[in-house]
């Protein structure tokens, strides 16, 4: 039996199996328990089963403390589920916004009167109202310069954040432990040929990467989404794709090779986003640096094996670790590695921080260097602009103030001229979408 003063430790993955037991537990104690929820960002999706289950079980707890290093990742709406868990749709989370906003058919922002003004956010439809009140626009890969996820009713949102969230940044209590360095690589002739093949001959290569669909109308609607997928893949392993010609390894890999040979003589970690990239760098580094110890970790590696590999990596002087960023996002520390290379971008900064903060710890000695390596004149510039637009919102949630774009760009060592190199989605006279590459139209 659980007596007063005891701690009950449970993982989110177990809540489904223990739902009935926890309901009985909460009822017997009249909800007079203290909930301490670590990594509360795991319930940022208000429609996910995990979120609904957590809220159902613990929303009436008398005391609640939520802790996370990443309150939001992609949108301010991700804050709502955590607020709902804390305040249980009570008078502590009243919607003071008199106007709500939404996107019309032309993707322009329209507004209307808020029927729920001066009432608590409702249990049903509260997340939708939260979005309409504060952040109706959604930044996309092609729409950074148009929307930039503007924040509406800022004063009301700031008031809610100020009374709820206490933020401490890593640099505030640990000092300057790391710096971010951005490198852009000029695509080679072969890489540019891959981009052109994807955009101009997509219908010819579609079957090489995607299975055919019976619903041709749906397949047509997925065209641009699939093109984006291939353009992103072409920024990591273009030499494995249709249309490539030239050197056996891409320009990005060769730049990393030069850095390893002439600058990065100590331990180095390379974070990839796909297994194809991990395999490519494993082959490339074995060929170019046979004298340096090489360690490879993929997502299917068990925890004990992973920890054993990291312990061996720690004991080397000039070892190279190649892994997927997702495989090292939690539960491990590698305090002695000073150089971390982000080979490809994930969809938001917090996800990438979860990876490279495995190497940046409170007790780390010396400066850590995080290298973002991207192709210029490629979809990666859209991705970079997208993650920085999201980071601007994340900063607002942390401190209640709108950070200037220039400050975010400076923090991540990015030139504001990035906007001029973006791929864009446009519509022709017949209503068909096409992709623009810089100032040039490519159907």
For each feature predicted by the language model, list its residue ranges:
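Conserved Helicase C-terminal RecA-like lobe
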Residues: 6, 174-191, 199, 213-332, ...
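Conserved RecA-like ASCE ATPase "motif II neighborhood" in helicase/translocase motors
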Residues: 9-34, 42-57, 323-328
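Inter-lobe coupling linker of SF2 helicases/translocases
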Residues: 9-14, 28, 48-62, 90-240, ...
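Conserved RecA-like P-loop NTPase helicase motor core
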Residues: 44, 294-382, 390
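Conserved helicase ATPase motor motifs in RecA-like P-loop NTPase domains
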Residues: 61-76
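A short helix-turn-beta junction within AAA+ P-loop NTPase domains corresponding to the substrate/partner-engaging
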Residues: 79-93
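A conserved SF2-helicase RecA2
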Residues: 347-353, 360-442
